[in-house]
Amino acid sequence: MKETVVVAMSGGVDSSVTAALLLEQGYDVIGVTLQIWPKDAPEGAEGGCCSLSAVEDAKRVASKLGVPHYVLNFRDYFETEVIEYFGREYLAGQTPNPCIRCNRVIKFEGLLQKSLALGAAKVATGHYARIEQDSATGRYRLGRGIDANKDQSYALFNMTQEQLSRTLFPLGGFTKPEIREKAAQLGLAVASKPDSQEICFIPDNDYRRFLEERYPDHRFQPGPFVDQEGNVIGTHRGLPFYTVGQRKGLGVAFGFPAYVIALDVEHNAVVIGPDEAVKGRRLLADDLNWIDIAGLKAPMEVEAKIRYSASPAIAVISPVKDGSAVIVEFAAPQRAITPGQAVVFYRGDWVVGGGTIVRNLDLKLPEIRHPEPKPVKGVKAKGRV
């Protein structure tokens, strides 16, 4: 009897070819598109995998391949678990990655649960990554896709063993050009469809405007720009509009190439400094998930990535706080260690695990020195004779 697999079809070339490859491999395929765009999105809104046109593309591909296709309403679930999370973290001075959250909670938790109702024990997506089971330990492993330019293992680091055991990534052994060529051979209209480069629920990538429109009653409180010595050198618009490493859009000329080196949430301050000050060698991470190992018991040398686009860098990870957090110490300074972003650990092509960056341990927030108020002419300063 054929095994049934639910394929998450976004209307793009990757998920379309995923469905085709699984058919060729002898699976019974059910195509599913998740309806997750916000309820208040305009009818013609485009947002990558969330747009209405993407659903139509997925339907057409499923029809051409001869597989059933369903649209599942995940709006409320996505709203609560991804969009609200994104806003909450930004308002708290963090820089979250909503795609990582979506992968774990929506695609590989919510969709897996729905797949059982459709008679499928497994799901498949068009991610460029690999899964295999270690014959010695029995653990499921997550590996880089062979196309280094498209590898998505970083954004999948928080998958559980259960999720990995029930997931297929057919594209992990292919390059993107090979997938486009395969789509063309199959006569799929999406063969040349461009990749989505946006956060799906923020089509124009303007997250600042998104926050202002979504939280109109929230006071984006202005506060001080301060230098590394704590001197107040300007006024910012509100912490959610800045992120570590940012140079453009600061809104103030400082007389030198200025970068955001930290957000001081307690004092509502943005710390500014030169490019060199953005770098650090040590960070603290928590909210850990381990894949290749059951847990970290002793220091381990790995390659670590502190953002999706970063190159892996040699580091030693050491457990702290009874193993609920790790200190990551890099061999060389890393630029823009950003609280809220993921740090992912590799050995060779395989993901060891990862977590969420709490803070740059090499950075000490300055004590803010507010300027003395200027005396008003003709008025004696209080306490003086």
Swiss-Prot record:
Interaction with tRNA: annotated segments: 150-152, 307-308
Enzyme class: transferase
Catalytic activity of the protein: S-sulfanyl-L-cysteinyl-[protein] + uridine(34) in tRNA + AH2 + ATP = 2-thiouridine(34) in tRNA + L-cysteinyl-[protein] + A + AMP + diphosphate + H(+)
Presence of keyword Cytoplasm: yes
Record-listed E.C. numbers: 2.8.1.13
GO biological process, one term: tRNA wobble position uridine thiolation
Residues flagged as site, Interaction with tRNA: H127, Q341
CDD domains with a match to the protein in the record: MnmA_TRMU-like (cd01998)
Domain of life: Bacteria
Positions bound to ATP: A8, M9, S10, G11, G12, V13, D14, S15, L34, G126
Cell compartment(s), UniProt: Cytoplasm
GO terms under cellular component: cytoplasm
GO MF term set: ATP binding; tRNA binding; tRNA-uridine 2-sulfurtransferase activity
Alphabetically ordered keywords of this record: ATP-binding, Cytoplasm, Disulfide bond, Nucleotide-binding, RNA-binding, Transferase, tRNA processing, tRNA-binding
Catalytic residues, chain numbering: C102 (nucleophile), C200 (cysteine persulfide intermediate)
Intrachain S-S bonds: C102-C200
Classification via PANTHER family: MITOCHONDRIAL TRNA-SPECIFIC 2-THIOURIDYLASE 1 (PTHR11933:SF5), TRNA 5-METHYLAMINOMETHYL-2-THIOURIDYLATE -METHYLTRANSFERASE (PTHR11933)
Cited function: Catalyzes the 2-thiolation of uridine at the wobble position (U34) of tRNA, leading to the formation of s(2)U34.
Family to which this protein belongs: Belongs to the MnmA/TRMU family.
Protein's recorded name: tRNA-specific 2-thiouridylase MnmA
